[in-house]
Amino acid sequence: MMQQQRLKQQQQQALMQQSLYHPGLLAPPQIEPILSGNLPPGFDSSTCRSVYVGNIHPQVTEPLLQEVFASTGPLEGCKLIRKDKSSYGFVDYFDRRSAALAIVTLNGRHLFGQPIKVNWAYASAQREDTSNHYNIFVGDLSPEVTDATLFACFSVYTSCSDARVMWDQKTGRSRGFGFVSFRNQQEAQSAINDLNGKWLGSRQIRCNWAAKGAGAVGEQNSDAKSVVELTSGTSDDGQEKVVNEDAPENNPQYTTVYVGNLAPEVTSVDLHRHFHALGAGVIEDVRIQRDKGFGFVRYSSHAEAARAIQLGNARLLFGKPVKCSWGSKPTPPGSSSNPLPPPAIGQIPGLSAMDLAAYQRQLALAKMAGAQAFMQPQGQRIGAPGQGIYDGGYGGIASTQPPMYF
């Protein structure tokens, strides 16, 4: 009996040891991490002995960080750069193998309930300055898509200079969109035209021009400029100046979708039906300014609103492609209301019987959580150069209705 237990323990240890390595790729003496982070194109890690650590909880101290990373090998140095919301740091090893082992085993490890990001550290000069490059937005990314995957997809265009997936700082998961930079404007436009609606991973991606400043992925952070910068596939920590945490796309208090370019005949009921059919989440309120051609749809959560923006942007409503972005004001805590009841299915002006039947089928599938399968046909994804995905909506709207936070 004891011998069986000992054999079982040895098997479990062997399985744990195997999990440290990329399956079927490298033997233990050649351990190499899976490069899923945001490294410069052509980055060579063969001589690296330092790792970047991002998304560090504010309660983590430098001695604790040193203790955690010493588990994979002796350290030459350890530096923690403190920030109010999340810190970052750099760990230097005496040998490359220990650094590689740290990336494989410690990336995603929770410290005080917050997953840390670990990847190779590199000099700022190794990354090309993309501040004057042409940036495109790539939405509806599947969870498995990394910076490396995104760059590989767009690198068929020779002027592609950088690619970054936006990650949730608290969960460590992809937020479902990213940005790609190009040196040549025409190639950026070609990428939008050619790859919009194409499959990447398990989803069809949506491509459009990024809002001005949103895709400035090449900007450097002053704290890390002279040493190393972000390499973990996020735009937080070492890139805090690139992604503003108060911006609507990063602030969980923003739950309202601005909907522009509405046809004059669109009513609040029509708008409700349109967004309910997307199946993005629970709708709490719908408002419309018919004389100005725009409206607002408030969801119960930030994630649902983001999903609605991705699914709804450029979809046709009464023959016009609507423009979806974030509302300009956050929803104050405690102001959420009960979900709106599902809209009644009735005859929709401007639609043929065939269109209405298709809408009803789409609505039924949305209720079964199948709305993700509904993507507008390629020809209906209308996006003009310069059209931003997140442009903040409009404020200062006079209304006699109860206050809704746009």
From Swiss-Prot:
Organism encoding this protein: Nicotiana plumbaginifolia (Leadwort-leaved tobacco)
Stated role: Heterogeneous nuclear ribonucleoprotein (hnRNP)-like protein that acts as a component of the pre-mRNA processing machinery. Functions to facilitate the nuclear maturation of plant pre-mRNAs. Binds with high affinity to RNA molecules that contain AU-rich regions. May bind to the 3'-UTR and protects the mRNA against exonucleolytic degradation. Associates with nuclear poly(A)+ RNA in nucleus in vivo. Does not stimulate transcription or the 3' end cleavage/polyadenylation reaction.
Phylogenetic placement of the source organism: Eukaryota, Viridiplantae, Streptophyta, Embryophyta, Tracheophyta
Keywords, sorted A to Z: mRNA processing, Nucleus, Repeat, RNA-binding
Keyword set includes Kinase: no
Localization per Swiss-Prot or TrEMBL: Nucleus
SUPFAM superfamilies to which the protein is assigned, alphabetical: RNA-binding domain, RBD
Gene Ontology biological process terms in this record: mRNA processing
Protein name: Oligouridylate-binding protein 1
Domain of life: Eukaryota
Primary location recorded for the protein, binned into one broad class: nucleus
Domain RRM: from-to ranges: 49-123, 134-212, 255-329
Regions that span the bilayer: none
One of the record's GO molecular function terms: mRNA binding
GO cellular component: cytosol; nucleus
Residue numbers spanned by region Disordered: 231-250
InterPro entries: Nucleotide-bd_a/b_plait_sf, RBD_domain_sf, RBM42_RBP45_47-like, RRM_dom, RRM_dom_euk
